[in-house]
Amino acid sequence: MSERLVNHIREERARLGLTQADLATMAQVSRKTINTVENGVFIPSTVLALRLARALGTNVESLFQIPDAGRPDSVGP
């Protein structure tokens, strides 16, 4: 079963005034990796999710959620 993963990386990055390149440097990955994660093309590893959270000054749970299965438009806890 494939679950959809919602992420808030773009919003957090924009809130901090960072470009994809800035975040990529901070997380030690390529800008393309940031782009593919933001667009839901690539689901990050645990290590990458932790690096992104650290770079954005937040926690993984704030960046990534699995939508509630009962309500497709909602985000679970």
Tell me what each language-model feature is:
Residues M1-R15:
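A short, Lys/Arg-rich alpha-helix, primarily the initiator
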Residues Q28, V47-S62:
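DNA major-groove recognition helix of helix-turn-helix/homeodomain DNA-binding modules
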Residues G17-N35:
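Short alpha-helical DNA-recognition segment
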Residues N7, G17-L18, P44-V47:
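Residue-level signal for the short linker/turn that defines the boundary of a DNA-recognition helix
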Residues F64-P77:
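Short, charged recognition helix plus adjacent turn
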Residues A14, T25, R54:
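Alpha-helical residues within the helix-turn-helix
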